[in-house]
Amino acid sequence: MKFFDITVTELHQKLVDKELTVTELVSETLDQIEADQKVLNDFVTINREGALAQARAIDEKGINPDNIWAGIPIAIKDNIVTKGIKTTAASKMLSNFTPIYDATVIERLQANDVIIIGKTNMDEFAMGGSTETSYFGDTRNPWDHTKVPGGSSGGSATTVSAGNSIAALGSDTGGSIRQPASYTGIVGVKPTYGRISRYGLIAFGSSLDQIGPMTRTVKDNAALLNIIAGMDERDLTSSDKKVPDFTSKIGKDIKGMKIGLPKEYLGDGINEDVKKVVRQAVETLTNLGATIEEISLPRSKYGVAAYYIIGSSEASSNLQRFDGIRYGHRAQDVKNLEDVYVKSRSEGFGDEVKRRIMLGTYSLSAGTYDAYFKKAAQVRTLIINDFNKIFEDYDLIIGPTAPTPAYAIGAEVDDPTTMYMNDVLTIPVNLAGLPAMSVPAGFSDNMPVGLQIIAKPFDEETMYQAGAAFEAATEVHSKHPEMEDK
């Protein structure tokens, strides 16, 4: 079974009407994932036994007709802990780690009878933009198997794009949901910082990380956010703001909506085909009644530098816990305690993770703190101020999600500076803690291109409203890669 042309609501109705059982649905989904795994390598762990056991239990008690997620199988990025299911963060360091508790988002999914179908491949510890730094090998883009799917949530994006999962969860620290969503032609959302609990998310940059949904349609995405959002006492950065119905504005027109298009987002370094797709999107939104004006986010160009100092500094602190003592890889043939630390971390971490730990440790050291980390934090404040000023006059901001379409596997993995610049359009959103969506907008040489829609803090509903209106006015989302239906 492929999920190319069916929504969660339609699939739910099939289960309610007993056109198929949850066990049949899950079994077919598992078969399809396993058939494509050798080509795509989008999963680290496939939860066959656990998923089928959960499916049989739901069939036995019956489907709740009022819960559209009951019995629906979804995929989970492998940095979100799942009790009894191996969680590796795509690292040798955690290659045999099985958590003894569930992340808050997993608890909320299971409270709605959602079935965890498996754990998806990713860049190691979410550090990367191509899913090439995984200890378990790179994931391949379903549109072209020689291209990257983006990252770090490349496995989640790939399984949804390939039609093998109707939905997935990812995490976004500097664009890790939105950029792969753009590269694979799906809908990916980074909610407002604090909208979703980070409890049980293996930390990279604690002031930047946010879990979010990845789906084929805007409405499915909003519906998934409905059941995972909300305050959690175990995450003090989670917001106590009331969780609205994120689907409430979907279907409403956008006439009169005022949208800004930053001139910096269509400047040098942006692929010409990407610019063309965005200009066509502007025309579509204008025809729908929105007013789109050129704006400026002058400090956004400093976002990448600020992000890699702040993110790497937070990562160097967060990853100190992986030392071979309590959990994770432990080196053999060691002479003393220091040897345990040094050898375990040297063997357990990949090159990109080591690079960021070293960068972060340097930025936080006594002699360089003021020149690097403190300065980056000041730049972050200026970027936030730029967004706040724009949102005094505009409802939304739009632009390309990524500067280019997906590129060839191996093309940039040894050139970190070039790879880091692929997130130049998404990083400022994380620094400011804003909600943002990537929605399919067009193609360049048969590879998907996404439109990024950025909203005010805790105004995901307006973002979904505009995204759904754009989706309904185009045919882009109805196209899909040529993957064989097993």
UniProtKB/Swiss-Prot annotation:
**GO terms for molecular function, please?**
ATP binding; glutaminyl-tRNA synthase (glutamine-hydrolyzing) activity
Quote the catalytic activity from the record: L-glutamyl-tRNA(Gln) + L-glutamine + ATP + H2O = L-glutaminyl-tRNA(Gln) + L-glutamate + ADP + phosphate + H(+)
Q: Per the UniProt entry, what are the Gene Ontology biological process annotations, in alphabetical order? A: translation
Q: Which InterPro entries match?
A: Amidase, Amidase_CS, Amidase_dom, AS_sf, GatA
- Its Enzyme Commission number(s) read 6.3.5.7
Instruction: Show the Gene3D superfamilies listed in the entry.
Output: Amidase signature (AS) domain
Domain of life of the organism encoding this protein: Bacteria
Active-site residue list = K77 (charge relay system), S152 (charge relay system), S176 (acyl-ester intermediate)
The UniProt keywords, alphabetically, are:
ATP-binding, Ligase, Nucleotide-binding, Protein biosynthesis
The keyword ATP-binding is assigned to this record: yes
Family membership:
Belongs to the amidase family. GatA subfamily.
Its job: Allows the formation of correctly charged Gln-tRNA(Gln) through the transamidation of misacylated Glu-tRNA(Gln) in organisms which lack glutaminyl-tRNA synthetase. The reaction takes place in the presence of glutamine and ATP through an activated gamma-phospho-Glu-tRNA(Gln).
Q: Which NCBIfam families match?
A: gatA (TIGR00132)
Q: How does it assemble?
A: Heterotrimer of A, B and C subunits.
Q: What is this protein called?
A: Glutamyl-tRNA(Gln) amidotransferase subunit A
Q: Which gene encodes it?
A: gatA
